[in-house]
């Protein structure tokens, strides 16, 4: 066989279609089993009983034949899926060979590993799984792990179905992940094996992601092809030894999926990316604190969702800030939190502009736990402040000292907050309305501490003391500008302009970036230990090492750049000092 042309996407789609047909037939057989195998006699006479017994016997024979046919059908679908995966692996091998021919030393090492180490091991394992002896012994070999863990020891994962679109995981010791059903993700391998191929997208849908390769060695699965107008699915990643899977082909009008990340030690593939999407376009976000609430008036800690509404004064404040903001519009979007007070504060501006605010949980106030409804000026109020203040100083791992808080530490809080900011950014680019000042601007209504802590943890010109010396008042605004990729700059704080970072502030940010990376890495590794998934643990360790390594490498360059670029800008001027009122 010198030349073979195979439409691998069509082959994978055919396997998914056959699996769907099999699922439908099996469902019909099961639905007909009870009424046909247990036919009730029409009457109490012997003839009726004999006829019922005859029809029941025929039905039981049919069910036995149908079960055998279903087994053959499942085996055929698995073989067809395996064939599609085999062709996909061949394409990966060819692609990596081409990269090696172009002079890529890592690709050459990976090619050698694939050809002389992993390739033979994988081929031998698949031969055993598909051999008559392997199929006969599989129920015995896999019984213990199926009972204890619900997963085969040796074997390939099942193909996804309409009811369960994602491919099943491969055997714990050896086995490839199953192929995804239409739009489903490929299954992950166990210790050794390839990830399953993602399912093809349907009717403009995105192709499924390829499955993750084996914990020790194995290639990521290929992403599923996109439907018409849909993007291809991303290729699955390899963990320690193996190549990342190819991205699925995009449908007409879509784009191809990204190549999966190669193995940590040996492997080729795409690079991991940190951060959100976007094209680097800068936007402005006006963070606006809500109007006065009864809790504010009584100086109580009030953070729980949904919380109280606005006082009469708060409603007046909401209308006043709406009138002021409307004159500076139009806006790309309006956002608020799950708290009633932020929604009531956002409503007047939304009504003036005919817009519907989007609710983002990441804009909720930092949760006070058991300190809820206690006085702000009290030991509870001080303990509530300790953790968030530490977060702004570069220690997000410090826990919230309010028992019962859902924001257990600064890492949890900041990921929710930056997730909300990412959503605001994406929505703003999707509706790039330019405000009166020429910037794409969105308005986000939130609470004092979330606005203050969230901005100080992320802007490149922070001034954490502002949280204590100039807390944001009701309907006060904090303005930031930038994007998730290039970073954010604090433009103004409650109407007071904030200049670029001074040299000490810039150096503080450099140190902050250096010391926060290992904190995030340690927390992610700690969390991964509770998943019980070795792949999750390996990924957390790998991602953490990458993040810490990048921070260490970047630190001296950032310091040198800041020292060279230092120009002595006046940082802050005219900021009044007042009694803190940090808790809304």
Swiss-Prot record:
Gene Ontology CC terms: cell surface; cytoplasm; extracellular region; peptidoglycan-based cell wall
Residue span of region Phosphoglycerate mutase: 384-584
Record-annotated active site: 290 (tele-phosphohistidine intermediate), 365 (proton donor/acceptor)
Domain PE as annotated: residue spans: 1-92
Keyword Cell cycle: no
GO terms, molecular function: magnesium ion binding; phosphatase activity; phosphoglycerate mutase activity
Compartments in which it is found: Secreted, Cell wall; Cell surface
Induction field: Up-regulated under hypoxic conditions.
Enzyme class: isomerase
Record note on what altering residue 290 to A does: Lack of phosphoglycerate mutase activity
GO biological process: glycolytic process; response to hypoxia
pH dependence text: Optimum pH is 7.5. Active between pH 6 and 9.
Catalytic activity: (2R)-2-phosphoglycerate = (2R)-3-phosphoglycerate
Subunit description: Interacts with human TLR2.
PANTHER family according to UniProt: BROAD-SPECIFICITY PHOSPHATASE YOR283W-RELATED (PTHR48100), PE-PGRS FAMILY PROTEIN PE_PGRS11 (PTHR48100:SF58)
Additional detail: Could be an immunodominant antigen.
Role played: Induces maturation and activation of human dendritic cells (DCs), via TLR2-dependent activation of ERK1/2, p38 MAPK, and NF-kappa-B signaling pathways, and enhances the ability of DCs to stimulate CD4(+) T cells. By activating DCs, could potentially contribute to the initiation of innate immune responses during tuberculosis infection and hence regulate the clinical course of tuberculosis. Involved in resistance to oxidative stress, via TLR2-dependent activation of the PI3K-ERK1/2-NF-kappa-B signaling pathway and expression of COX-2 and Bcl2.
Protein name: PE-PGRS family protein PE_PGRS11
Organism expressing this protein natively: Mycobacterium tuberculosis (strain ATCC 25618 / H37Rv)
């Amino acid at each position: 066989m010198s030349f073979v042309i195979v439409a691998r996407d069509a082959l994978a789609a055919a396997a998914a279609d056959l699996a769907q047909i099999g699922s439908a037939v099996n469902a019909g057989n099961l639905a007909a089993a009870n009424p046909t195998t247990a036919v009730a006699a029409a009457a109490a006479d012997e003839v009726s009983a004999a006829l019922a017994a005859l029809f029941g016997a025929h039905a039981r024979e049919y069910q036995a034949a149908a079960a055998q046919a279903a087994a053959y059908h499942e085996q055929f679908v698995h073989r067809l899926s395996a064939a599609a995966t085999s062709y996909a692996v061949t394409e990966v091998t060819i692609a990596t060979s081409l990269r090696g021919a172009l002079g890529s030393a890592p690709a050459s090492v990976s090619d050698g590993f694939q050809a002389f180490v992993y390739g033979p091991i994988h081929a031998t394992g698949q031969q055993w799984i598909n051999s008559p002896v392997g199929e006969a012994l599989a129920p015995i070999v896999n019984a213990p792990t199926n009972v204890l863990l619900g997963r085969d020891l040796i074997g390939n994962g099942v193909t996804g179905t309409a009811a369960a679109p994602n491919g099943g995981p491969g055997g714990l010791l050896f086995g490839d992940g199953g192929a995804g059903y239409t739009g489903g993700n490929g299954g992950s391998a166990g210790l050794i094996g390839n990830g399953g191929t993602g399912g093809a997208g349907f009717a403009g849908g995105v192709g499924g992601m390829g499955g993750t390769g084996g914990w020790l060695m194995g290639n990521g699965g290929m992403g599923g092809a996109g439907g018409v107008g849909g993007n291809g699915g991303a290729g699955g990643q390899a963990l320690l030894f193996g190549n990342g899977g190819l991205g699925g082909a995009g449908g007409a009008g879509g784009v191809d999926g990204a190549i999966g990340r190669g193995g940590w030690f040996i492997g080729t593939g795409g690079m991991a990316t940190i951060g959100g999407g976007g094209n680097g376009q800068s936007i402005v976000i006006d963070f606006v604190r809500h109007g006065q609430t009864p809790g504010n008036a009584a100086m109580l800690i009030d953070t729980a969702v949904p919380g109280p509404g606005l006082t009469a004064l708060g409603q007046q404040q909401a209308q006043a800030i709406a009138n002021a903001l409307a004159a500076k519009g139009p806006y790309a979007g309006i956002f608020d939190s799950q708290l009633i007070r932020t929604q009531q504060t956002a409503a007047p501006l939304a009504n003036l502009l005919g817009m519907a605010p989007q609710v983002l949980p990441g804009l909720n106030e930092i949760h006070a736990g058991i300190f809820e409804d206690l006085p702000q000026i009290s030991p509870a109020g001080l303990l509530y402040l300790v953790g968030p203040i530490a977060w702004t100083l570069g220690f997000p791992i410090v826990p919230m000292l309010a028992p019962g808080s859902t924001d257990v530490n600064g890492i949890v809080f900041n990921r929710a907050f930056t997730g909300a900011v990412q959503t605001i950014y994406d929505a703003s680019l999707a509706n790039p309305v330019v405000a009166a000042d020429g910037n794409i601007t969105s308005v986000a209504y939130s609470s004092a501490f979330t606005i203050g802590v969230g901005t100080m943890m992320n802007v490149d010109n922070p001034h954490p003391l502002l949280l204590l010396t100039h807390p944001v008042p009701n309907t006060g605004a904090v303005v930031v500008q930038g994007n998730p990729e290039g970073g954010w700059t604090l433009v103004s704080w409650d109407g007071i302009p904030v200049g670029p970072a001074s040299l000490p502030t810039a150096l503080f940010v450099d140190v902050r970036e250096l010391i926060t990376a290992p904190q995030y890495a340690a927390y992610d590794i700690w969390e991964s230990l509770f998943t019980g998934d070795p792949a999750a643990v390996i990924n957390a360790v790998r991602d953490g090492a990458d993040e810490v390594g990048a921070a260490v490498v970047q630190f001296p360059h950032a310091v040198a750049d800041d020292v060279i670029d230092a120009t002595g800008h006046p940082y802050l001027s005219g900021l009044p000092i007042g009694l803190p009122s940090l808790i809304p």
